[in-house]
A protein has these predicted regions:
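A short, charged/proline- and glycine-enriched loop
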Residues: 39-47, 134-135, 203-208
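Active-site and donor-binding regions of nucleotide-sugar-utilizing enzymes
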Residues: 50-58, 62-193
């Protein structure tokens, strides 16, 4: 047997092995039964708020929950696809939360519930399962805006409408995307700014300086984080500023980052902040990993 034939044979075996592994994963993905509803008694609602991922990304959904909770003109149901996210959400919102892991059940639910709109907070891969449903308007609202390259994903073309904060987002899409219909973009502002938010910190006469770094992204092209490069130096410079209160508010995905350098420097930043707080208790230095950024 030639080296080429041997190589081809090995590649075929590896391909089959990978295919079997993927098939098992896809099968296991649907092993959990639906929860929170019965297909024989499908809930009625105007809007389905769709969340495809697990607990580490729940911040993408929870920032939108108060917006829909406060709207008495329409009924909203939250659809989640993963059981750990479903369990984490139970008891945290007055909105009805239902678990639909399997594609067949999702299609049956969408068909019978007759939602007017399905709203997406990210570009999770199972979004495209829900997008196959024809009789609803599919709206992408994202989970914040910035000048990151991921804010102008080509996936925006998949949705009927993409809600954005303002003109900067429209300009961003126009500059980055080819053959994109700008009429799909709808300016809605930032609805969360209209909500009442309880302050996370007491008032102080000191100057409050907040360090709120982002995470490293899914790939290097989306890595805008300063945590592993300048984080400790930034905190130390803030501490050295006279009459200041230092607040460290990292992106929700910094603490459990897959990057060891990010995790290590995050811990070092927390340690530096705690040390500064112990040296000057009256300053009110603090680490706020779970607080709403609008409350800081």
């Amino acid at each position: 047997m030639s080296a080429s034939s041997s190589s081809d044979s090995w590649l075929r075996r590896q391909s089959k092995r990978a295919a079997r592994s993927l098939a098992r994963r896809m099968r296991d993905f649907g092993q959990v039964e639906p929860a929170g509803f019965d297909l024989a008694d499908v809930p009625s609602a105007d809007i389905a708020l769709y969340f495809p991922d697990g607990p580490p990304k729940l911040y993408q959904l929870t920032q939108w929950l108060p917006v829909f909770e406060g709207n008495n003109d329409v009924t909203t149901i939250v659809i989640v696809r993963q059981v750990d996210a479903f369990n984490a959400l139970l008891g945290t919102t007055p909105l009805r939360v239902i678990l639909v892991p399997q594609y067949e059940d999702l299609m049956a639910l969408l068909d019978r519930a007759n939602f007017g709109a399905v709203v997406y907070v990210n570009n999770g891969w199972t979004n495209f399962q829900a997008l196959s449903f024809q009789r609803a308007v599919h709206i992408h609202v994202n989970h914040g805006e910035s000048d990151k390259i991921c804010m102008v994903s080509n996936q925006a073309k998949a949705y009927d409408k993409v809600f954005v904060a303002g003109q900067a987002a429209i300009d961003r899409h126009e500059a980055a995307l080819a053959w994109f219909d700008q009429s799909h973009l709808v300016r809605v502002g930032r609805p969360q700014l209209d909500l009442e938010v309880n302050p996370a910190l007491p008032l102080t006469e000191r100057t409050t300086i907040t360090y709120a770094p982002t995470w490293e992204g899914e790939d290097e092209a989306n890595n805008y984080s300063s945590v592993d490069v300048y984080g400790v130096q930034i905190i130390q410079a803030m501490v050295d500023h006279p009459r200041s209160r230092i607040v460290y508010k990292p992106h929700p995905r910094v603490a459990d980052s897959d990057d060891p350098a990010i995790r290590s420097q995050h811990r070092a930043i927390v340690a530096a902040g705690n040390e500064a707080a112990s040296h000057d208790p009256a300053a009110g230095h603090c680490v706020l990993e779970d607080a709403d950024m609008l409350a800081v």
